Amino acid sequence: MARIRWLTRTSRIVALCSAANFINSADRVIMPIAIVPMTDIFQWSLHAQGWILSAFAFGYFTSQILGSFWASKLGAKNVLICSVLLWSIATFVTPFLAHSLTALVICRIVLGFAEGLGLPTIFHLFAHSIPVEERSRAFSYLLASGSVGQTVASVLCPHLTWDACFYWFGSFGFIWVSLWYFVYPEDAFSSEDTIPLHMPKVISRSIRWADFILSKPLWAIYVAHFAMNWSSYIIMQWLPTYLARYLGGNAHSLSLTSVPYIVNSIFGVISGHVADGLLLKNWSVLNVRRLMTSVGLVGPALFLAIFCVVDHLPFAVVLVSISMGLSACNSAGHLSNHVDVAPNYAGTTFAISNTIATIPGILCGPVTASLVTAFDGKWMTVFLGATFVNLMGAFIYFTNSVATQVL
């Protein structure tokens, strides 16, 4: 069958990668929603729920650097196909393994491992295929697609049986693999000339692992990413449970968990266009990255601080939605900063950053369960802790970030 050619090469890459991120993000949202009815069936304790939710992050943590390495050695196309196929299989078989807590946790680890390969591979692809003047938009569309995936899953899953959620979204991944084969531009890495004119050519120099670890500008990015993910993981993992158990939500109310992701996707696209617009108005890249990161970390911190004292469910959803929306500004902030400071190694720096930023995903499950249990079912310490982490991340990024090439 003839390959599809009705989009430009860059557009096809962005569209395909965004579709992969849609499925990636949708699959990871299913369990936080499904765990509410599953707990009624399997009678899991709050701590057991915490470990089920955090098991994903254990796998995700281990595969970040591997994703970047394999993409450079084996080809981004091959790595991305394999990762989507593996995480789709893990999603599809989850209902069959749910009767065994151990088997379910292992399946969640495999899911996390496969999904962890995705974004570093995509960053590797973007770093070699997207011109500088289009990067903010490309990253914004990429991350917005993840929010759309989370939105779709959050809307549909409360109205499906818990096992059907896994079957449907697992099947989407199988469809994507076929689309990738027919739409992917084969010439994406065919020659050095495919690297955009406005992107630095690969520099032949010796890079040590210490260069990725000892750079203050890179640590500014790593810390900002960690801070962003701390609050994001709490919301992703625990918002359905919080609305259902603490604010008295029902199946209809759980559909409201889609609203934060809708707002996040809209803000993500808007922030990308705003950032590119500021660059066209001669703002420095550094000032744009700092502005977007400050809005993306300080804004959510303030709204989470208010969210934790509200007991009116619709108002609580409004507050957490604004928080998630402002968080999307990070896509044009520190997340885009990788290709500014390390254009030839953006896949590797993102892999390291995402590995560090996965630690909150490992901790948020058991730590949240322990805090809620210790404070007699109160969640205030959970959200105030996230507020503090966000504010510290914003301060460290603002005072240490650069936009010049360091690697």
Predicted regions and their residues:
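Extracytoplasmic
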Residues: 12-46, 235-240, 364
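Residue-level signature of mid-helix packing/kink "hotspots" within the transmembrane helices
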Residues: 29, 57-65, 116, 150-151, ...
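Extracytoplasmic gate region of multi-pass secondary transporters
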Residues: 31-32, 215-271, 330-331, 361-365
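Conserved MFS/SLC helix-loop-helix module at the cytosolic interface between two early adjacent transmembrane helices
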Residues: 62-102
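Structural signature of the two symmetry-related core transmembrane helices
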Residues: 78-93, 286-305
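Cytoplasmic helix-loop-helix junction between adjacent transmembrane helices
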Residues: 107-146
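Glycine-rich segments within core transmembrane alpha-helices of 12-TM secondary carriers
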Residues: 136-158, 263-268, 353-365
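Helix-loop-helix hairpin linking two adjacent transmembrane segments in secondary transporters
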Residues: 142-188
